[in-house]
Regions:
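Bacterial N-terminal signal peptides that target proteins for export
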Residues: 1-7
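N-terminal signal peptide c-region/cleavage motif recognized by signal peptidases
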Residues: 17-19
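Extended carbohydrate-recognition surfaces in non-catalytic/accessory domains of CAZymes
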Residues: 23-116
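An acidic-aromatic loop/edge-strand motif
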Residues: 52, 153-225
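Aromatic-lined ligand-binding clefts that engage carbohydrates, nucleic acids, or primary amines
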Residues: 66, 109-136, 140, 176-178
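Solvent-exposed beta-strand/loop surfaces of large extracellular or lumenal domains
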Residues: 77-86, 139-160
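First transmembrane helix
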Residues: 213-244, 352-370
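Interfacial "cap-and-anchor" motif at the non-cytosolic start of specific transmembrane alpha-helices
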Residues: 261-303, 307-316, 325-445
Length: 445
């Protein structure tokens, strides 16, 4: 049987005094849905309240004094990462700027479906930062672990939640509640809470929707999954050049390629699985891998061009890397949360300055490599170094107003993905040229 999967916005019920984000004293009426074999996005109306109380999951709680919010997206709206449709700004744009912590969303839905039909919910696919989903007061699940003082956050992924109670005579009223936690690391002008509403429908339709959402998520990160394999292959080729016992050194190039492969693969690991928590991902990426990658790539190009091999550059980069790691850890919003905001702001500002010094040393190394070497191989190497730099210094390019992502065919492709794809091709050609040059030298002996 073919099922039509469609996402239709619900009719907004109730009056608003000023806007959808303002407080309302009007009780939210129950929304009625005739499902059949279909899927409906639960765009609203929702009751919303900051704070946390597990009793708010109960259908018996009076939420008439809560705020009323609408999650209906603008036509064509999608998230800024992989292109998932249905995006709306978070609570920071809805009267709660600067708020970090817990909040609840509640809505009542009367479903008029087929008798004994299996119903399910598709969880929200974009939430700052994690959530638990309840139906009629019963916890259905969610991507976060809420057992500690603050939740352990994992990536929000497309998820199906079977509804526990089948409609009696085809009709049932559900109280859907979402307990949301926003992590300090997600603070931002548009952030906070649900960005893409959950959907309700018959189980088969929800399964199809889930497959579509996973396909979109897969397409958004498939390049990040493939590029690390290419980086590892390039590292193996560079290591083979070392085995030839040439006078050139490639150990820093091998290290830089492997670190970059890890950096890219770690993003896929976080967004496709629940192996790594948000804080673990933050430490591995921002505190460890990024500083190490900046240093090793500068040393890799120094050795490639054969310029100024005195130890001063290595000593400076080691010091900068250690400083970068310490400052980056201090500046993490979740680390040592009792520390003053001013201390963290200073640490993050100093990280920006360290990155600028790293960028200056990186560009200096490329410039020194080109002086007096305007042959094809040197120009290609400089081009490859610039392409890597586009990924390494993505934050600085974004601050300069350089566009960071495009959505060809509705799927997000980042500036870094484009740059690394070009770099892989150029470096592969350069390594083959080096192999050919070494072979010619051996033949001439």
């Amino acid at each position: 049987m073919r099922y039509a999967v469609w996402l239709a916005s619900l009719i907004m019920l109730g009056a608003y005094a000023t806007s959808a984000c303002s407080a309302s004293v009007e009780p939210v009426q129950t929304v009625s849905i005739s499902l059949g074999h279909s899927v409906v996005a639960l765009n609203g109306p929702w009751r919303f309240k900051t704070g946390d109380d597990l009793r708010w999951a109960s259908p018996d709680i009076d939420d008439s004094q809560w705020e009323t919010v609408d999650l209906t997206p603008a036509p064509g709206a999608h998230d800024a990462d992989v292109g998932l449709p249905g995006y709306v700004p978070g609570w920071s744009m809805r009267g709660h700027s600067g708020y970090i912590g817990y909040a609840w969303y509640r809505t009542r839905v009367t479903v008029d479906g087929d008798k004994d039909a299996r119903l399910a919910l598709a969880g929200p696919t974009d939430v700052d930062t994690t959530y638990q989903l309840y139906a009629d007061g019963k916890l259905l699940g969610g991507p976060g672990v809420f057992s500690g003082k603050t939740p352990t956050v994992y990536s929000v992924q497309p998820t199906v939640f079977p509804l526990p109670v089948a409609p009696v005579n085809g009709t049932h009223t559900y109280l859907i509640a979402l307990r949301v936690w926003m992590d300090p690391s997600d603070a931002g002008d548009e952030n906070g809470g649900i960005h893409i509403a959950p959907s309700i429908g018959d189980a088969d339709g929800i399964d199809l929707l889930n497959q579509v959402q996973w396909l979109q998520t897969f397409k958004g990160y498939v390049v990040d999954a493939m590029e690390p394999l290419a980086f590892v292959l390039l590292a193996i080729i560079a290591a083979a050049l070392m085995v030839r016992r040439s006078s050139d050194s490639y150990r820093w190039l091998v290290a830089a390629l492997l670190l970059t492969a890890w950096l890219r693969a770690n993003q896929v690991l976080f967004f496709w699985t629940h192996v790594e928590s948000l804080h673990a991902y933050d430490v591995i990426t921002a505190v460890l891998l990024v500083p190490l990658a900046l240093a090793t790539w500068t040393l890799a190009w120094r050795d490639w061009f054969g310029v100024d091999k005195r130890p001063w550059l290595r000593h400076v980069l080691v010091a900068l890397t250690i400083i970068y790691m310490l400052l980056s850890l201090i500046g993490r919003p979740w680390f040592a949360s009792e520390a003053t905001r001013g201390l963290k702001d200073v640490a993050n500002a100093l990280v920006d300055y360290v990155r600028l010094i790293d960028a200056a040393l990186y560009l200096w190394t490329i410039g020194r490599g080109l002086i007096g070497r305007f042959r094809l191989s040197a120009c290609l190497a400089a081009f490859a170094a610039v392409l890597v730099g586009v990924g390494l210094f993505a934050a600085e390019l974004s601050k300069l107003g350089v566009q960071g992502i495009w959505f060809p065919y509705g799927t997000g492709v980042s500036r870094t993905q484009f740059a690394y794809a070009g770099f892989i091709a150029v470096l592969f050609a350069l390594l083959l040229m080096r192999f050919a040059a070494y072979a010619r030298v051996r033949l001439c002996r």
